[in-house]
Design a protein with these regions (language model features):
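Nucleic-acid-interacting cores, centered on viral/eukaryotic replication and modification enzymes
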Residues: 1-179
């Protein structure tokens, strides 16, 4: 996808963006049988939780801010069954091309969009980071957290974050999360 296509050619903000995904419909095991994955359940925040955050953000002196995690899934390593992938020729390192390799595979180390377990690993990684920053889980709602000192309520829906609370604390909350 071309971003900022309205800008003149050569402009620093005009660029093409894409995403490499794990195409789960072509996964086979070492015996060439279709692979079966054990589902690692992820549970993003609900619509009710989002509305509760909106309500909290509407209190006097409060606000709401949203942000996306950058390249969320690739922030965490893939665990479990060792997985190998074929890279498109355009992504091959020069050494593979020079050796005239045929159909090489390499281990998949980072979670990728499309892998059945990526969502669960991202959620585990994200929650562990959030908890180290002083946020506490809200037991009744998965992917919902409260920071008692800053009085911030945060929900996470996959890689989208919504933070609500006192206006003067919102930026401090984001700064904590980005450490």
């Amino acid at each position: 996808v071309e971003k900022n296509s309205e800008l003149p050619d050569g402009h620093k903000d005009k660029k093409f963006k894409g995403r490499i995904v794990f195409e789960g419909c072509h996964v086979k095991d070492e015996a060439n049988n279709w692979a079966i994955f054990s589902e690692i359940a992820s549970c993003p925040a609900t619509m009710h939780a989002s509305k509760a955050a909106d309500t909290y953000g509407l209190f006097p002196g409060h606000g709401i801010m949203q942000a996306d995690a950058r390249q969320a899934y690739t922030q965490c390593t893939l665990k479990g069954t060792e997985t190998y992938v074929r890279l498109p020729y355009e992504a091959w390192p020069e050494s593979w091309k020079e050796r005239k390799m045929w159909d090489p595979v390499c281990p998949l180390r980072l979670s990728l969009y499309g892998h059945p377990d990526s969502g669960g690993y991202w959620e585990q990684h994200c929650e562990s980071h959030v908890l180290t920053k002083g946020f506490e889980k809200i037991d009744e709602w998965r992917s919902c957290y409260y920071h008692p000192e800053l009085k911030l309520f945060m929900i996470i829906y996959v890689d989208d974050f919504k933070l609500a609370g006192p206006n003067e604390n919102l930026q401090m909350g984001w700064d904590l999360l980005q450490e």
